[in-house]
């Protein structure tokens, strides 16, 4: 692929911003992603220009794994497949000996179809379907989480030789998506569950927690890891062979240096001298920055100068929306869009074009299908121009629906900003 070469790192039309927030990535990531989009739009009639498309940089995934092992060398990542089940991501991480966090039979089947051994899978769903539990037993996926007695009973009946990981209650109030109200046993409940498991002859091998997705407070790990040590010791006293600590997910590439520093300190503080295997379940950390989404402008609406609605004077309508790739925009602001002209040219930095504020809508007939409000973009934007959105790889394409008859599939162009990952194209 021409845009997956070293030469593209020197292109002169980089727009402002960098799609890669990893310290191990450079301008080449920016260049080849933009080259891929430009090349796509320059194709006259080989594809349906009415549909959005994506560009995935596998070099980003590769480099973020290197960054992880540099900052947290004693914590093995188990990629959260739910975040983005793209097989290319799975292939890269599998080749780097990553583990995988799966929540269902389908996810386990997917990663094992890519050559992942069952020993490198954690069935990290505290409340599992019986059929999925039976599939795990048949496939040899022994490590799994639980947080209640009913789940223990289910496992006792169908997979008594499983290696159990007790999910403890933890929370970061600053996280975008909290999980504490749905999963996690309190300290008192954890002790009772350890005793129950022992009396039933079940083997608890470790403790896990999840402070929430897209966590922002590095200090939230201190209390969670301290509590994990207390439950870990309770398991040892009960007679379990405790040897695993799972610190969950929620990591963002943006603040990972601070997060990693806090985690290293907490592990040294609470698990110093303990023979323990430490794992984590990062998802968006690997996937978010790997994907850029390009959307076409299919409509523009401008109110009359005397219109009383000052807030919605200028509107753009895209061929993707919150029922598609932008579903997370319902819960948090999405990335700032950048401009790609219908000709395939990027909007120049030195443009003297006037800007105005737009409301950006998705293509459906639902009034809540709003991608963004009050976004400053060039006044000259027109139908058939394109906007592109960086960092769209997490919880986006995998959640896309076919509501209103719009396609849920997104064509994806694969490339690599690092030659070491070119073999996965």
UniProtKB/Swiss-Prot annotation:
GO terms for molecular function: ornithine decarboxylase activity. Its main location: cytoplasm. Its EC number is 4.1.1.-. Pyridoxal 5'-phosphate binds at residues 213, 250, 281-284, 395. The modification N6-(pyridoxal phosphate)lysine is found at residue 82. Keywords: Cytoplasm, Decarboxylase, Lyase, Pyridoxal phosphate. Pfam families: Orn_Arg_deC_N, Orn_DAP_Arg_deC. It is found in: Cytoplasm. It is an enzyme of class 4 (lyase). It comes from the Eukaryota. Transmembrane segments: none annotated. PROSITE patterns: ODR_DC_2_2. CDD domains: PLPDE_III_ODC. Pathway: Secondary metabolite biosynthesis; terpenoid biosynthesis. Belongs to the Orn/Lys/Arg decarboxylase class-II family. Its cofactor is pyridoxal 5'-phosphate. Homodimer. Only the dimer is catalytically active, as the active sites are constructed of residues from both monomers. This is Decarboxylase flvG. The active site is at residue 365. Decarboxylase; part of the gene cluster that mediates the biosynthesis of flavunoidine, an alkaloidal terpenoid with a tetracyclic cage-like core connected to dimethylcadaverine via a C-N bond and acylated with 5,5-dimethyl-L-pipecolate. The tetracyclic core is synthesized by the terpene cyclase flvE and the cytochrome P450 monooxygenase flvD. Substrate binds at residues 331-332, 366. GO terms for biological process: putrescine biosynthetic process from arginine, via ornithine; terpenoid biosynthetic process. The record marks 210 as: Stacks against the aromatic ring of pyridoxal phosphate and stabilizes reaction intermediates. It comes from Aspergillus flavus (strain ATCC 200026 / FGSC A1120 / IAM 13836 / NRRL 3357 / JCM 12722 / SRRC 167). It catalyses: N(6),N(6)-dimethyl-L-lysine + H(+) = N,N-dimethyl-cadaverine + CO2. GO terms for cellular component: cytoplasm.
């Amino acid at each position: 692929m021409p845009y997956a070469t070293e030469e593209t790192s020197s292109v002169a039309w980089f727009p402002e911003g960098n799609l890669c927030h990893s310290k191990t990535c450079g301008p080449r990531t920016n260049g080849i992603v933009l080259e891929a989009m430009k090349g796509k739009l320059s194709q006259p009639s080989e594809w349906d220009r009415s549909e959005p498309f994506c560009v995935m940089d596998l070099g980003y995934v590769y480099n973020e794994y290197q960054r992880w092992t540099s900052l947290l060398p004693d914590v093995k990542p188990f990629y959260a497949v739910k975040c983005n089940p793209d097989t290319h991501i799975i292939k890269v991480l599998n080749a780097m000996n990553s583990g995988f966090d799966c929540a269902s039979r389908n996810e386990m089947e997917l990663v094992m179809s890519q050559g992942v051994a069952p020993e490198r899978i954690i069935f990290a769903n505290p409340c599992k379907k019986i059929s999925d539990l039976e599939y795990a037993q048949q496939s040899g996926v022994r490590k799994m989480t639980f947080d209640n007695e009913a789940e223990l009973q289910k496992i006792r009946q169908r997979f008594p030789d499983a290696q159990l990981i007790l999910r403890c209650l933890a929370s970061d109030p600053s996280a975008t998506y909290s999980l504490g109200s749905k999963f996690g046993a309190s300290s008192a409940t954890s002790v009772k569950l350890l005793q129950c498991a022992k009396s039933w002859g079940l083997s608890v091998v470790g403790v896990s927690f999840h402070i929430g997705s897209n966590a922002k407070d590095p200090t939230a790990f201190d209390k969670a890891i301290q509590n994990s040590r207390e439950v870990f010791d309770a398991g040892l006293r009960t007679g379990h062979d405790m040897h695993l600590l799972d610190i969950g997910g929620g990591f963002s590439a943006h603040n990972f240096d601070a997060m990693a520093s806090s985690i290293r300190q907490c592990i040294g503080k609470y698990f110093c001298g303990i023979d323990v295997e430490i794992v984590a379940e990062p998802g968006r950390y690997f996937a978010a920055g790997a994907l850029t989404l390009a959307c076409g402008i299919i409509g523009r609406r401008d109110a009359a100068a005397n219109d009383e609605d000052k807030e919605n004077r200028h509107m753009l309508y895209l061929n993707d929306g919150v029922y598609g790739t932008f579903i997370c925009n319902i819960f948090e602001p999405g990335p700032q869009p950048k401009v790609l002209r219908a000709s395939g040219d990027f909007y120049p930095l030195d443009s003297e074009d006037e800007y105005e504020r737009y409301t950006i809508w998705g293509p459906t007939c639902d009034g809540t299908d709003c991608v963004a409000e009050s976004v400053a973009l060039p006044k000259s934007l027109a139908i058939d121009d394109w906007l592109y959105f960086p960092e769209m790889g997490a919880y986006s394409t995998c959640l896309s629906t076919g509501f209103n008859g719009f396609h849920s599939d997104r064509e994806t162009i694969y490339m690599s900003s690092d030659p070491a990952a070119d073999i996965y194209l």
